Amino acid sequence: MASSKSDPFQSIFAFKPHRKRHNFIFLHGFGSEYSSFKHVFKLFEKKRWSFFAFNFPGHGNNQSNSVDELKLKHYVELVCDFIIQKRLKKVVLVGHSMGGAIAVLVNAVLRERIKALVLVAPMNQTSFVVSKKRILDTLFTRSPKNQQDFIEHTDDKKSIVNFFVGAFKKRVNFKTLYSDMVQNAKYGNDYLEAGYNAIKDKPTLVVLGSNDIVTPTKASVEYLAKHSETIIFKIIDGVGHSPHYYAPKLFFDYIGEFLDNIKRNKDK
């Protein structure tokens, strides 16, 4: 049985080489877990890049029934506490979907400790505004290209549709968290909007999938570009909401180019 309280740091997955230039923290999405980045972790280890990852309350091996813990603001507080406790600096936050929203909100709180943001299909005010026709087309046109939109990146490859149906029927915690996310993503909600406004000139890489129907690609680019002129956008063709999972090498290469670009600009 899940406990009412949880400790997201009880099972941290970390790689800490002796010499490190950056401290990466991976922030997973709704209903996912840090293992969604497992292919990327292998590439980081080969490069000897330091990173940390953990599961938010209600996810993976960190189950919780506490309504107070299943909120976006609580997740933000947890990440901020982790950075402060570990005395981390030069932090690069890598956030997917909900984790992307958490990343921008953490940056707004601990701006001096955050070196850069890597946002993967980040939740924003264009999220959850999905065309019903596009969903149906994706469900009933079973081509490899659009099928990926509805494949969850867990090991058993469950359909994301079945995942949501099962979660909503059996698990009150996901209902609570999903409602909180939708509320935070609505137009007119100052909390998440303030986070995106706080990006300003912070080096930021946004990676999107061309077939994403959860975080609409074109609308997200237009929305995010209004908040910062320095954001670098990369769109990976043929993938949906999890470009880091379906194209890990390309995703990793984009991060490398992004960091090299930051260094060049600093050396000027």
From Swiss-Prot:
EC numbers, comma separated: 3.1.-.-
GO molecular function: carboxylic ester hydrolase activity
Keywords from the named record: Hydrolase, Serine esterase
Active site: 28, 96
The keyword Hydrolase appears for this protein: yes
Pfam families for the chain: Hydrolase_4 (PF12146)
InterPro entries: AB_hydrolase_1, AB_hydrolase_fold, AB_hydrolase_sf, Hydrolase_4
GO cellular component: membrane
Family: Belongs to the lipase/esterase LIP3/BchO family.
Stated name of the protein: Putative esterase/lipase 2
